[in-house]
């Protein structure tokens, strides 16, 4: 456990706790190495790095309020009521602690476990990276009744040399205050980013997620660019991750009223690992496990998820044996049966996090698995044995037994899906027009709505690297079906075979035949429905294709503008307005479907990599995506109708993150 001496050391967070590792020179040269991209995702990553510093104060018990404000000029303010960045003079660098944190890469109290027990920052480099990539940064620290301020700016000198994150003047005391904490204002540099406009909904969703993960902490969000009711929002969840699971299951039918919740700790001092788990089964067929470490979403899972799954399987099999649900002669049920319809949130707090790869989305610490397994075994077992919870335990076991029967029914269908030789005579033959290229990294698969458009696409494509799979009917809504029903559907089976990866538990990314999978559908309600059905299929059964960046949506033009022999295509209403501004004597054609374009037009506008627009499908907020898929594709009609009425605009593309040529 965390000792009193340890807690005292953490309260005594001072300038001496700041460790310096290297300088800041490379950030402007290669920003992608630090924030991933200079597009929308990288822009928001800047905000997350400052927010996570504030959240770390809350996670370690030193702050209760975190607020974010987006101003009309696109500058952003992040404020907390924590301890405040140390303002004393650093012994080695002879400048204030604030200046060290914002000008030195790998500088901060997070490298010292006495200052932070748990930290979710970008290996401590976040503040300095934000400074390097901003037009200006202003930091105010309120501590000990005094207010301190320092401003940094980035500028180009007369010789054209760029200077990034330079202090305008040293940290100065500017007044007295009753406040406590840190306030950071920054303006992302438009010389670095493709856009400096933060997406209000992206920010709100992430702050809501953080509020669920940090029980009792208030997150305030103000967007001064807005004038509607969404200008000011506030999130606080006294139920923490229990409320989170209730939100995730809000459009589903739970099997028991209240989520199961337990918490435990393993290890002491800097080796302490705190585990929080909330879980609830519903009557659906897919498992939805959301894992986090120090508030960081681990969308690819890792050792903590593995530990949760293995312990849950053992605890439930032991329960089924004790209660006679499983006889002595019966084999134990596999974990997937106990996880059918499960919604769970697994949240860890630990120091010295180790991630696999550079994305920080898969936890690699072996001790995390051991801790989670032990805590699940110790905490879940007595919950199930409590007579008050007999209905709950029976519901989980009954669900698993039914899943086992369905799994056996699906075994033959799964085998067929895996064995190419048995599927070569399936409906796929004569349907897929494959490409001649044998390099998956270069090959593209277009999944096209309708035989008519599919025929034009087959004629217009570059058959060296582009394959065409027309859909003759609507794919199955997999949200409402078990896997054996999915495998019986011709359209789904054709897609599975074309991809080559298998699905679900049998998915193997290394077998992917096409590294770009492009959905082509009409720009109308039917086309939107088909896109939704396909994306639901990919999300539920081949999620790694989305997280790996392999799934795209093609953006065919909405309009053809012709004046004389000159033809121009417009992909949305705004582009049409720009093209036709001041133009006279033109003819306008509104495309109602892909089938209205001949092969040459389809190649020129939609297939040709030199001209086309693609939208990459990404998962920025896994929990929100889960909620939305359930809302739009699940059984409950009223909330779906309400959402579509409020949000649907089938010609909008600006909600997508990046267009890719």
Region annotations inferred by a language model:
Residues 1-17, 24, 48, 56-58, ...:
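GHKL-family ATPase ATP-binding module
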Residues 85-108:
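Short conserved segment of the HATPase_c
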Residues 101, 107-113, 164-166, 308, ...:
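Surface-exposed acidic, glycine/proline-enriched linker/cap segments
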């Amino acid at each position: 456990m965390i000792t009193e001496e340890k807690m005292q050391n953490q309260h005594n967070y001072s300038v001496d706790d700041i460790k310096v590792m290297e300088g800041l020179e490379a950030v402007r040269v290669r920003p992608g190495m630090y924030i991933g991209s200079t597009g929308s995702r990288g822009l928001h990553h800047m905000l997350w790095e400052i927010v996570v510093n504030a959240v770390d104060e809350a996670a370690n018990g030193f702050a209760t309020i975190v607020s974010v404000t987006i101003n009309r000029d696109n500058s952003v303010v992040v404020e907390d009521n924590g301890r405040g960045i140390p303002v004393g003079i650093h012994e080695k660098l002879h400048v204030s602690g604030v200046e060290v944190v914002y000008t030195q890469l790998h500088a901060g109290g997070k490298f010292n476990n006495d200052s932070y027990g748990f930290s979710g920052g970008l290996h401590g480099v976040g503040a300095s990276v934000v400074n390097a990539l901003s037009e200006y940064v202003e930091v105010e620290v309120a501590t000990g009744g005094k207010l301190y301020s320092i401003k940094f700016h980035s500028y180009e000198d007369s010789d054209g040399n760029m200077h990034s994150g330079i202090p305008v003047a040293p940290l100065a005391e500017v007044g007295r205050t009753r406040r406590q904490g840190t306030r950071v204002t920054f303006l992302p540099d438009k010389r670095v980013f493709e856009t400096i406009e933060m997406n209000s909904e992206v920010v709100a969703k992430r702050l809501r997620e953080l509020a669920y993960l940090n029980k009792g902490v208030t997150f305030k969000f103000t967007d001064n660019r807005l004038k509607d009711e969404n200008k000011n929002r506030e999130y606080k969840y006294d139920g923490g991750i229990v409320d989170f699971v209730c939100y995730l299951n809000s459009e589903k039918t739970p099997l028991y009223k209240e989520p199961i919740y337990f918490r435990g700790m393993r290890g002491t001092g800097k080796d302490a690992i705190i585990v929080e788990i909330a879980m609830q089964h519903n009557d659906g067929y897919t498992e939805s496990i959301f894992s986090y470490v120090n508030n960081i979403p681990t969308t690819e899972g890792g050792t903590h998820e593995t530990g949760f799954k293995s312990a849950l399987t053992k605890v439930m099999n032991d329960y089924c044996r004790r209660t006679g649900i499983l006889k002595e002669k019966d084999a134990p049920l596999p974990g997937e049966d106990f996880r059918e319809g499960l919604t769970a949130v697994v949240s860890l707090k630990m120091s010295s996090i180790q991630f696999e790869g550079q994305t920080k989305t898969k936890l690699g610490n072996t001790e995390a698995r051991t801790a989670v397994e032990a805590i699940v075994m110790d905490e879940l077992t007595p919950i199930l044995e409590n007579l008050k919870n007999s209905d709950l335990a029976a519901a989980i076991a009954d669900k698993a037994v039914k899943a086992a029967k369905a799994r056996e029914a699906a075994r033959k269908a799964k085998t067929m899906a895996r064995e190419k030789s048995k599927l070569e005579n399936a409906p796929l033959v004569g349907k897929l027009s494959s490409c001649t290229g044998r390099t998956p990294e270069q090959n593209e698969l277009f999944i096209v709505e309708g035989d008519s458009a599919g025929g034009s696409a087959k004629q217009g494509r570059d058959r060296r690297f582009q394959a065409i799979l027309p859909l003759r009917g609507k794919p199955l809504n997999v949200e409402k079906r078990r896997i054996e029903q999915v495998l019986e559907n011709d359209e789904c089976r054709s897609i599975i075979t074309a991809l080559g990866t298998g699905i679900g538990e049998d998915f193997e990314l290394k077998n992917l035949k096409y590294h770009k999978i492009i959905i082509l559908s009409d720009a109308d309600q039917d086309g939107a429905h088909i896109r939704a059905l396909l994306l639901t299929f990919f999300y539920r059964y081949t999620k790694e294709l989305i997280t790996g960046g392999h799934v795209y949506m093609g953006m065919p033009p909405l309009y053809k503008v012709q004046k004389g022999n000159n033809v121009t295509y417009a992909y949305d209403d705004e582009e049409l307005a720009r093209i036709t501004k001041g133009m006279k004597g033109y003819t306008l054609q509104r495309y109602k479907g892909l089938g209205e374009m001949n092969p040459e037009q389809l190649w020129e506008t939609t297939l040709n990599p030199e001209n086309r627009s693609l939208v990459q499908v990404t998962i920025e907020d896994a929990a929100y995506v889960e909620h939305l898929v359930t809302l739009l594709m699940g059984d409950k009609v009223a909330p779906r109708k309400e959402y579509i009425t409020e949000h649907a605009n089938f010609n909008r593309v600006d909600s997508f993150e990046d267009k890719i040529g």
